[in-house]
């Protein structure tokens, strides 16, 4: 196991591992600990009481953060005709049909979000092995397979993030950058927490959110008190 840097070790001394912090206090602490030489991403991680072997307990969706993500998203849209024009007018960075599919098959992946109209999915489906592992495959559950391409583009540009349980029931979601004011990070954090709570599968029994932490790119995790929401 790699040895942690002195900066990380110094940051870890600021965290009481036996304490669950108020959400605002936790975010402040992460900002204080951050030592990256760039504007690091702040991320929240949920440990959920779900059995991901059960299809109805696999969470997946998307939410628009009220204060954005701090990242300019490059958005592509697979569409034709009026829908292609609609996507362009909404500010999509690249719009195309077979040509765009071919471009990706040739190795181009310089984008953050892919959106498609339903009638394009027969062609886009050929990209599953390329886009799927990178989390870029258009999907109705995340609002990226839709006829309302203008809304999808606008949401993505405004700060939409996706979430999905991994096989151990964890969900990791970015909430912004260390440079954000604490209240903006907390606002995004609360929006995600509310979204996850509302997505609770009906079949889950007992405590749904078992643990919740916030961290940045290089800092230790800080446990958050769920009662502070």
Swiss-Prot record:
The keyword DNA damage does not apply. Keywords: Repressor, Ribonucleoprotein, Ribosomal protein, RNA-binding, rRNA-binding, Translation regulation, tRNA-binding. It comes from the Bacteria. One of its GO terms (molecular function) is rRNA binding. Pfam families: Ribosomal_L1. SUPFAM superfamilies: Ribosomal protein L1. GO terms for biological process: regulation of translation; translation. Belongs to the universal ribosomal protein uL1 family. Part of the 50S ribosomal subunit. This is Large ribosomal subunit protein uL1. The lineage of its organism: Bacteria, Bacillati, Bacillota, Bacilli, Lactobacillales.
């Amino acid at each position: 196991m790699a040895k942690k840097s002195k900066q990380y070790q110094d940051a870890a001394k600021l965290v009481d591992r036996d304490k669950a912090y108020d959400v605002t206090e936790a975010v402040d602490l992460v900002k204080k600990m951050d030592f990256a030489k760039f504007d690091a991403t702040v991320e929240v991680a949920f440990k959920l009481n779900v059995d991901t072997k059960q299809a109805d307990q696999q969470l997946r969706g998307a939410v628009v953060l009220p204060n954005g993500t701090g990242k300019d998203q490059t958005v592509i849209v697979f569409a034709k005709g009026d829908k292609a024009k609609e996507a362009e007018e909404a500010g999509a960075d690249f719009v195309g049909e077979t040509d765009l599919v071919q471009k990706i098959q040739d190795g181009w992946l310089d984008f953050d979000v892919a959106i498609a109209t339903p009638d394009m999915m027969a062609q886009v489906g050929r990209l599953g092995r390329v886009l799927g592992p990178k989390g870029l495959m258009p999907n109705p559950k995340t609002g990226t397979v839709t006829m309302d391409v203008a809304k999808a583009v606008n949401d993505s540009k405004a700060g939409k993030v996706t979430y999905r349980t991994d096989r151990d029931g964890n969900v990791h979601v970015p909430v912004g950058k260390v440079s954000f004011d604490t209240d903006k990070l907390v606002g995004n954090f609360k929006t995600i927490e509310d979204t996850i709570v509302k997505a609770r599968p009906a079949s889950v029994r007992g405590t749904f959110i078992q643990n919740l932490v916030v961290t940045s790119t290089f800092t230790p995790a800080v446990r958050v008190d769920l009662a502070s929401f």
